[in-house]
C-alpha cells in the first residue's frame, strides 16, 4: 500500500462545529477546506477521500449550517464549510452563513488548500463564479473539483473550460472513487 493510501486510512476524529470565529480550533498542522453549492456531493467526497464516513450525507440539501472541523491523524485539519445557494433558507440565514464562511476564509492562516466543488452535470453556476471571484486573493490555494463524473453531461460549457484553464482541477466520482486518488495525492503533498 502506498504512503498516500495508508495516510488516508488513518483515524479521523470530529473536533467541533463552529458558528463564530472565536470557536475555531487552534492548530499546529495544515488545514484543508471544502466548499460548494448545496447538493454538490461535498460530504460524499470527503467520506470517499478519507475512506470512512466522517461527514454526514443527507437526503435534504442545505443542512450544514456551521463549519465542521475534523482532525485527521494529528497531521491535518479537514474543514467542511456550509453549502451555498440553497433556496430554502431565509435571506437572514443565507447572510449569516455567508458571513461565517467569509470570516473563516479571511482569517485562517493555516488554510493550505480550498477545494471548490462544482457539479459536473450542471457546470458552474453564477454563484460558483461569484464565490471564486470573491476568493481571488487566495486563488493559488484553490483547487476546483468537478463532482459526479459518473453521471452523463450534455456538453462542456465555455464557463467550465475557462475554469479548467485557470485553476488546478480534477473531475471525480465519489460513487466509484474515480479521481479520488489524484485528489488524495494533492492533499498528501501539502503535509
Language-model features and meaning:
Residues 1-88:
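Conserved G1/Walker A P-loop phosphate-binding module
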Residues 39-40, 46-47, 75, 113, ...:
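Structured catalytic cores of enzymes that bind and process phosphorylated ligands/cofactors
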Residues 100-168:
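Conserved C-terminal guanine-recognition region of P-loop GTPase G domains, centered on the G4
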Residues 7-22, 150-191:
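Canonical P-loop GTPase G-domain recognition
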Residues 70, 147, 183:
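Residue-level signal for inorganic ion chemistry
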Residues 73-111:
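Conserved nucleotide-sensing/catalytic segment adjacent to the nucleotide-binding pocket
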Residues 51-52, 63, 94-97, 131-135, ...:
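Glycine-rich, phosphate-binding/catalytic loops in enzymes
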Residues 63, 76, 83-86, 121-123, ...:
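Conserved nucleotide-binding/hydrolysis micro-motifs of P-loop NTPases
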Amino acid at each position: 500500500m502506498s504512503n498516500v493510501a495508508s495516510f488516508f486510512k488513518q483515524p479521523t476524529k470530529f473536533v467541533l462545529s463552529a458558528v463564530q470565529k472565536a470557536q475555531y480550533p487552534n492548530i499546529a498542522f495544515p488545514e484543508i477546506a471544502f466548499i460548494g453549492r448545496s447538493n454538490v456531493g461535498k460530504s460524499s467526497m470527503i467520506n470517499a477521500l478519507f475512506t470512512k464516513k466522517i461527514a454526514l450525507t443527507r437526503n435534504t440539501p442545505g443542512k450544514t449550517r456551521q463549519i465542521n472541523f475534523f482532525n485527521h491523524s494529528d497531521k491535518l485539519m479537514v474543514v467542511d464549510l456550509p453549502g451555498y445557494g440553497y433556496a430554502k433558507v431565509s435571506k437572514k440565514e443565507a447572510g449569516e452563513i455567508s458571513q461565517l464562511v467569509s470570516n473563516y476564509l479571511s482569517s485562517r492562516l493555516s488554510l493550505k488548500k480550498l477545494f471548490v466543488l462544482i457539479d459536473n452535470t450542471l457546470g458552474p453556476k453564477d454563484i460558483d463564479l461569484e464565490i471564486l471571484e470573491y476568493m481571488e486573493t487566495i486563488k493559488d490555494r484553490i483547487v476546483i473539483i468537478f463532482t459526479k463524473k459518473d453521471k452523463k453531461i450534455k456538453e462542456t460549457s465555455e464557463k467550465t473550460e475557462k475554469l479548467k484553464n485557470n485553476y488546478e482541477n480534477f473531475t471525480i466520482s465519489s460513487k466509484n472513487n474515480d479521481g479520488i486518488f489524484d485528489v488524495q495525492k494533492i492533499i498528501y503533498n501539502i503535509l
